[in-house]
Amino acid sequence: MKSKVDKPVTNGAPNATKTKAKEDRKRAKTQKSEADSQIPAKILKKSKKEKPAETEEKENTASNANLKVSQINKAVFVVFKKMQGSQLTKKMINSLITLLRDDTNAEQRTATTGYVLKRLIRSTGADDMKTVSLAASYIHCILNAVPAIDAFEVLETLKRDLAVGSQQRGKEDSLAAVGQLVTAFCILQTPQFAKAEPKLVTAVFQILAAQLKGREYLVSLCGDILAVSFKQLPAAIFEEYVWPLLQPELNKPLSGLKVNTCDVLLAVHLTFSSVLGRENILASLWPKKPVYTQLFDLYFSGSTIHSDGVYARLASFLVNGGKDMLAAWQQYIDSKQPLKLNAAKACAIQVLSHVLLNFKPREEQLILDIFTPTCVQFLLHECSSVKWDKGEGKKPSLKKLKEICFKFEGSLVLCYEKQFQNDDNKLHLLLKLLEHTLQLDSVISLPRFCQKLINQLSVESLHKLYDYYNNKLYSLEDEDRVSRVHCLNQMQLILNHSKLSQTAKWRQKQLNYLLLAGLFHLDASKKPCEAAQASAFSRQCAARCEEIFLGSLLHKCSGLPGLCQLLQKTLSYLNKELGQPDAESKLRSPRDESLQKAWKQVEKLLERPSKESDVVGQSFEALILFVSLALCTKIPPSITVLEDLIICRKNALQKSKEQVNEELKWQDVLTDALLQLLLQTGHFWREFVQLVATALIPHLEHGNLEQVLEVLNMNKNPLSKKSDGEEESDDELDKEESLKDSSDDSEDEDEDEEEDEGEDDAESHLAQIRESVRQALVNDGDADDDGASSVDWNDVDEEQGERLNAALERSFQMFRPKSRKAQEKERPTKSERIDSTNLLHFRIRALDLLELFITKKPTQSVILDVLHCVFQVYSHCAADSKLQSLREASLKLLKKILARNIELKENQSTAPILEAIEQLMSSGEEHSEEDQENGKQPASRQAKRDIIIWRDRCFAYLVSQASADGEPKKSAVWPLLVEFLELWVAKRRSRLSLASFEALFQSGQWQGVAPLAVVLASHLDVQKTRSFRRAQILKLLSEQGRRLEVAFKDNNSSSKKFEKQIARYVNQLETKASSSKELNLLLKILAQGGEKWQKLREQIQLVAKDLQPNKKVAKQKKQAAAKPMVVEDEEST
């Protein structure tokens, strides 16, 4: 964009000169000089018709003498060329600053600096906002980073090259005025201006003050700059040098001011109260009597949304005005409702936001008075409008209003956190908002807004707010179920608040009420009643009360003793209510005879609770009480669970071992009960089982762990209602059907794959049908006979005919296209989807029990069995998108297992660990790493790759655990490791991979890195090991250089053996052919050895040099062999 602000005149020049200059400027042609060829905003060249005398006079001035092309550093043109048309980067600006600051030639530096500033200052007057901002950022950086620049010279350049007429006429003067303001603002931020020299202050503020009478956007920009600059000046300097310059435009009645000039006046008052006190400003605005509505009208009029600072200064003025001014503001806002202009709405909301952030503690009640019902309605309506307005093509004013509403919400939260001191005022303001909109978060964009306000309340206020929501449950209209549920959710939030954890008595009272509301029908007086007399709240929200009660009962429970104590109090209260007349008829789910019979045992348990020292007794007590409580709910568990727990408790607490039933131990029944409880819906069951199981795990046996592991057997469905025999027979039938389906088309797998992809044509499909019919017609003994495809029906008896008929029917049915109904039948039904979801959640919860086992009993058998099971679960879920939650849970537990050490007993054999390693490594498929490098990988790459990665990590973990106590080479796992390594080296296809040994190197706990490196180096044999395996070994050793260096420092003997093997390998390479890749990897390893391997490194370098000519010769021979032979045509000769 071309800039049209190149003026040969300055302020104060005669009018005739200005007129002539403008005419010349209009006639001037845009020609580029060598120096000005790369400016961001192109500068017009001087008119050729300018008088020679004027030219000579201007060339003799000092400022223009510095801009001669011959004196300018030519490197600056390169920098400007890079800047043009590219985004501003730190590297660009640093290159320009370095050029201006580090030039040792003073004359050249001065000329270059002047030229740079001239170009950039002219660019600030461009008719393009992006160009102006870019040039201003460069000027700001240069003035702050180059100390040799004089601010007065910048001002002179500004007045000369970006002059503005005394009367701003036309677009050129307006653009030049913007450039002057921007450049002046850059000077205000320089270290030189920070010294506050009177001469510089006067010069800069003369430029700023001159724009207070310009166009509206210039006055707005100038006002913002002035308000910021006041904070940099001492009061004395401002009063003597700046205030006289501003008074002509500011010292006027309110009727003579605009919003921006009034804003500058408020900024002077707020910054320099000693210069312009409150009485002085009031007298200036209203010579007779203050009329605050005139001030408010000034800010509300117009359609422009001003900058945030304008509203912040008005808010500070209101706060300082005390009760009268805030009351006048509140009345004015209410009287203007409803506001129609977005600018007026923005003003009201922005000012209120800043009032909330700046009021004084003694004015809390005044702030509360501002939030009248009318004001609250206006604020929440605007917040709701911007939240639910999802339109993309919005007006700029709507976008600004949306940001302002966001700021208001944040200001209110900050006010609660930092400003409000009186807790009653916090609660009062929150209740005002809730009275208008009960579901406050539905109209507020800030996430968890209501929760943030509630978190700032004290314990007493939380109790009051809880009562407010509780009373709302009965005062709402009968049909308003949504609001009642919301109130219950808020009550749950308050009930589980961390501040109320110490108020046990109040919390127990609320839990008792929720228990009553969840299990009984309640009337309008909150008393148990018959179903016919139940209130609307009881009919609509009893189920939700039940959920909240059970969830809150276990919230942040301190442990098993605390849980038992809480259940004792709760069950005692429930038992008391059940003892009332006709209590059974008032229950939402009346108890059956079996539960009433078992309830007598519960009453006995309440009379004689277990001691805290008796962990098993308390565990059973918690289980029995909680299950009996859950049996009274609408969705109870099976009554057999309670009966089994009562019998188990009796057996577990028997002192005589002879009376214990050896066939079925109480631990087995208890484990089954825990698993059955995990099947129940409701997150509280998972939390409850974890609480109880944490205390019981040390008392369980390995057989109980196997019960949990059986749930995670991915080949069986633990929720299946069929018996094992039925499942096996079903599996056999499925296998037979699959074999039967695949027998007809197994001859041509490629055609089948094409058919699956929808690429088979009708002809191939017909051939398949024909072959299927032929197979159906042949006799058992004629399968290989070529003539068996024909049948003589005269020789066919009735039995054989029925067989052929059935075979033909199966053949045609097999290839019959499936209808839409048949395809829909193949999709899982709703019940099947629910069952699969329940099974998924059940298995995830079962993983919690496994985590408790490895935490409480990290024995060898426990860790190995859990590790194998969890890895199998992960492997099964890795590629199944429907099991991703189970995959993540199993992977999370797998990481925890690998972080724990196995606790071995004294002289305990590590043979099970070796078996686990062999079982783990045999689980993978044989694969070729050479095929993988050549791109011949299977289709499901990522899932298999992830499985192999975690298998290798498990392998490294087991190896380190098997050799944790002694020297690795003397451990039982070392021979197995060497055997694995030999198999990997010898075989092309192997279950092991390079990553398996890499995982061993990366295992921080294992001490066998040094001897393993020696074994790997021993396989660097040109005669015995393939080149691909040698390259893999070299790659591994080169990548683990630092780890090897540390390992060899602690093991000197292994270090010497390793050097010996490497030296042997180097000697082999001198006589045997090798690849360049091999040599490069070997050089990398030798480079890590320093001076001691210098000789070996030189040997390899010679081998590498000899290899280059041989490669060229081989390449030439290969190219020659590939050339086609020219055979002469004998006939032509």
From Swiss-Prot:
Residues 1-62, 718-764, 924-943, 1111-1133 are annotated as: Disordered. Its main location: cytoplasm. Residues 20-35, 50-60 have a biased composition (Basic and acidic residues). Pfam families: DNA_pol_phi. One of its GO terms (biological process) is positive regulation of ribosome biogenesis. Residues 725-735, 744-762 have a biased composition (Acidic residues). It is found in: Cytoplasm; Nucleus; Nucleus, Nucleolus. Disruption phenotype: Reduced rRNA transcription which results in larval reduced growth. RNAi-mediated knockdown in the fat body results in the mislocalization of nclb from the nucleolus to the nucleoplasm. GO terms for cellular component: cytoplasm; nucleolus. The keyword Amino-acid biosynthesis does not apply. Keywords: Cytoplasm, Nucleus, Ribosome biogenesis. GO terms for molecular function: sequence-specific DNA binding; transcription corepressor activity. Signal peptide: none annotated. Has a role in rRNA biogenesis, cell proliferation and tissue growth by contributing to the localization of nclb to the nucleolus. Belongs to the MYBBP1A family. Interacts with nclb. This is Myb-binding protein 1A.
